[in-house]
């Protein structure tokens, strides 16, 4: 009798698992051993059934190649969520995380701009990890931040957490001291690389980026507002030498003319978007197509939309109200870190505002009519703890 009840209970458990799979693309940890059951039918997304391949393998194959998705009524985003549900079943999804991942599943050149406490860095690390582990032996994911300290505090910290919390044994070889997660021990080409790109590290980072040659390349630039333009320029070399290239730029909006602002510029100009615009197509990118910008506004945080603090790591109504009272709703800081949008003309105290510069087309460069003169200025910074600064300029008649 006990044996019969045991079989019945086992069958009921299996049926419950099948129903959960049928009703949700987020399959959770139940798939971990489902492939061992002869009664469980794999979703192969157009691939032939191969002995030994699990549901996770087919999700990864489908995510990389997009094969059979329309026929299977599935999207790359579905594959991504399925992979996450198998590998990290405890990850909590929210509206902003879904939008962020969706933007990367649908576009090759993506900018995320917006408020603090929006989960941008975690989302970037999660996407990079999933993207890489799907084909680690032919893939390089380059994650940059301004300094080594900020790299370890932000992006690499999230990579470490994902590595240690993975349900299955993590693939590859983690070398934390070098901020590298190699496909195999000693592989300096196919890996997740964490690079600092500022404060004396720019030339080395550019050389490292330009030296990467593999089939799949993903670039994630965190703190993009303070990232040297040379890092953005170095990506052109990568695009020309790989089969699949993707780029994500993350930052809090500061200026239309810093690297993050230029990468995020709407294809129809800044006048075509406003503080209520949540996403837009950007200028033509290396692939000849417009990029995509997704914006996170603290006033539309999932916690505020829900009317309660469900996600403690995202902006809350209490935090937003406190910042509004402390800084004022029209302060540059409130625009940058809370509204997540570029401050309107007149808010920043500058000699020439960006509206005037845009009107006079200053960003398009100059045509000099006569001989030009190159000038330079240096602040040696003998005291006060500041770093020395050297700048060059050209002057002449336009």
Describe each PLM feature range.
Residues 2-378, 390-397:
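Phosphate/NTP-binding elements of NTP-utilizing enzymes
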